[in-house]
Regions:
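Short hydrophobic/aromatic-enriched beta-strand-loop microsegments
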Residues: 59-67, 80, 123, 165-167, ...
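Conserved acidic, metal-coordinating active-site core of Asp-based
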Residues: 93, 97-212, 224
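Mg2+-dependent phosphoryl-transfer enzymes with acidic/Ser/Thr/Gly-rich catalytic loops
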Residues: 1-3, 16, 22, 176-178, ...
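Walker B beta-strand of ABC/ABC-like P-loop ATPase nucleotide-binding domains
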Residues: 7-8
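Residue-level signal for inorganic ion chemistry
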Residues: 32, 43, 66, 143, ...
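Active-site phosphate-binding/coordination module
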Residues: 17-119
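Short, structured coil segments at secondary-structure junctions
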Residues: 57-58, 66, 159-162, 215-216, ...
Length: 256
């Protein structure tokens, strides 16, 4: 096994249930980097929602915002976005369906949000308030809103020719540029670094990690992953609360 890059989903995979990363996991990741292996986070979170963990583990690259952005130490090197017209049309469609719906719009590392409780949010306390009463002048990498059902979200996605992403057990839906996602971002990064997909180990737990695990040479599911992810994984490690990522890397990459 010649692993040259490690791809890490955050929530439910690298992070424990309390949102922390164990010292053992941080130690193992640093040992991998010391051997010349790229450590990359690949998360649906916005950059500002992942910033705390970026500072903690100092990955070589950050794939965030459902694969629409790649940063290297905070510097953007790749972006896939909706045009300004589509961005504003989606926002208006969402507000037409429900004038009270909460909407977040990511543009690069900045996030707009029409919530009055931004300061109370653990993930998005650095978001900028916007009530969307005036059109935005930016390209959105990702728009997320809470909607009553999937059918409503699908109608908006079809009308605006964008990709729809849903999340396990939640009524939040993401609207992404057509063709965007973790898989496309990984392909772009592998091309930049001239690394074969066969030499990448990817770790995940949820439905939106499946393509990533299937595409890479080694797909690893944590024990708490949904059944669909475990079914397609090449290997299953311990759960996120049992240092599953670190245990697998120590055994199969560091040979400890």
């Amino acid at each position: 096994m010649n692993i040259k890059m490690i791809l890490l989903d955050l929530d439910g995979t690298l992070l424990r249930s309390d949102g922390s990363i164990s010292d053992r996991t941080k130690q193992v990741l640093k040992s991998c980097q010391n051997r010349g292996i790229y450590v990359v986070i690949a998360t649906a979170r916005y950059w500002i929602g992942a910033e705390r963990y970026i500072e903690e583990i100092q990955p070589d690259y950050e794939i965030t915002t459902d694969g629409t952005l790649i940063h290297r130490h905070g510097e953007q090197i790749y972006s896939c976005s909706l045009d300004v017209e589509t961005t504003n049309r989606i926002i208006q469609d969402l507000l037409t369906k429900n004038p009270e719906t909460e909407i977040t719009v990511a543009t690069g590392r900045q996030v707009f949000w029409n919530s009055l409780h931004i300061s109370e949010s653990k993930k998005l306390h650095k978001a900028v308030y916007n009530d969307y009463s005036e059109p935005l002048s930016c390209h959105a990498n990702k728009i997320v809103a809470e909607l009553a059902d999937y059918e409503t979200a699908e109608q908006i996605a079809v009308r605006n020719h964008c990709r729809l992403q849903s999340y396990r057990g939640e009524n939040w839906y993401a609207f992404l540029p057509e063709g965007a996602g973790k898989v496309q971002a990984i392909r772009e990064l592998a091309k930049i670094l001239e690394i074969s997909l066969d030499d990448i180990a990817a770790f995940g737990d949820d439905i939106n990690d499946m393509e990533m695990l299937e595409m890479c040479g080694t797909g690893v599911a944590v024990a708490n992953a949904v059944p669909e992810v475990q079914a397609i994984a090449d290997s299953i490690t311990l759960s996120n609360d049992e240092n599953g990522v670190a245990v697998w890397l120590a055994k199969n990459v560091l040979m400890e």
